[in-house]
Amino acid sequence: MACENCYLKPTFEMKSLIVLMLSSLLNIASAQNTPVGIFQANSDIGNPKKAGSTIYNEGDQSYTMKGGGYNIWFERDEFHYLFNKIKGDFILTANFEFAGKGNNPHRKTGWMVRETTDEKSSHISATLHGSGLTVLQWRASSGAAMRDPQDEIFAKDSSFNVIQVERAGKNIIMRAAYTGKPLEMIGSHVMENLPDEVLVGPFICSHDSDTVEEVKVWNVRIDRPVADNYDPGKSGNLGCRMETMDVSDGKRIVIFEKTGRFEAPNWMPDNKKLLFNMDGSLFKIPVNGGEPEKLNTDFANNINNDHCISFDGKLLGISHSRQGMPGGGSSVYVLPLEGGVPKLITENTPSYLHGWAPDNKEVVYVAMRNGKTVYNIYRNSIEGGKEVALTDIKAGEHVDGCEYSPDGKYIYYNGHYSGTMQIWRIKPDGSGKEQLTFDNYNNWFPHISPDGKWMVIISFPPDIDPNSHPSYKRCMLRILPVNGGEPMVLAYLYGGQGTINVSSWSPDSKQIAFVSNSGK
């Protein structure tokens, strides 16, 4: 027989306490699954004793992550995770730096690709330890014990600054780099049990249940690569990001994103806006981001990515395609920088503008002439007259990206005469040809800083056609002295055509702007 006094009846106070506790738990769960920066969620995995957190710093678009956890090892894991759900192939790239010396040399951070948020989930992690140890580690299936060394690939070097992970089908590839250096292949592993949709993102684990460690993550990019034979004309363009970068530290800021295509920013002389081409027109956008504003170019509505601003900041040169003209009809025009009616400079086509003379009276461009099937470098007065050929290359060779130095002594360009595409310079009369880069990359589009000291180039992989600068490739932006020297990497990006076809230096020579492809 039941006893009516054998249990306590809930009081109003008890109900209020229960509601408060449930509300607190819901708030914690909600906070952990709130989007942070470009990520959909952040959460502790495996219920670590010390809770983790992530703060997104909007000013520099970096992430400060804190996390505890005994380890990411054996049959289960404890750590803090910042992640997105993604299907298909991807490329993950970021800089990582631990805060302070830390309490355990085995604290770890990096990129993780994970099946679920379950503590026993299968995963593969590109890991940087507090000691500098850099390793690719994995759990092949849910609940399996991670083994040393069977489930690891160790890097020969240590203490890398940049970590990259790429998925190509079932294969997971890890690369890493020191600041200013190209990415190195660390290793790869086929993860047969990972589904098409996975979680991807950076993580932090203290390797000590009673401790919380901290890491800063910046230049975070998630790119969606396409097949090498992808044709944007047939299959559509990938999304784009407009980025700016401080060349002294390589920190990048995304100021504008779009699902369609835009290209080739110029930094405006007032240091307040960028100019870029999109959908056949030119647009201005504040350097800190905002809504693009269309520039008046009158009839010119088929403008490509070859446009540049005169040294005195008064005139704008564009390449606009005229319908029905040979070779696609690209022609060089000049108009006021504030907008207006373009004036035709090159009657013959095709002609692609790349630079101005420092006296603001001439332009330099590449063109096909006299029935030849190769491009050569030409200069011409903006007042008209006979154009002057500066190169005379052979069939199969290629030159492009011609640009004056601010002192007017040289014209820099990229040229393929044998082997890979490299950077060269000539004098304004075409004499004194001099090679400046000598590596295995295909180097394009030299852009000289306004102070005349530095050159930024885009470097394509060795395996592409040297005469081609295609879209959607794994590229680098690199910087070197104008007289030559070892290039230093500024950025690892997915891009190519339209990334930095024309000069995008800021007037103070401290920043550049460029376009990367997001895959959106």
Where are these regions (language model features)?
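Bacterial Sec-dependent N-terminal signal peptides
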Residues: 1-33
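Structural motif
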Residues: 239-241, 281-283, 326-333, 373-378, ...
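Beta-strand C-termini and the immediately following turn/loop, strongest in propeller blades
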Residues: 230-236, 256, 269, 274-280, ...
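Extracellular glycan-recognition regions
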Residues: 32-231
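Multi-bladed beta-propeller domains
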Residues: 244-261, 287-303, 335-350, 380-398, ...
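Blade/loop signatures of beta-propeller domains
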Residues: 228-248
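Short loop/turn segments that connect beta-strands within the blades of beta-propeller domains
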Residues: 168, 238, 270, 278-279, ...
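Conserved beta-propeller blade repeats
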Residues: 259-275, 301-316, 348-366, 394-414, ...
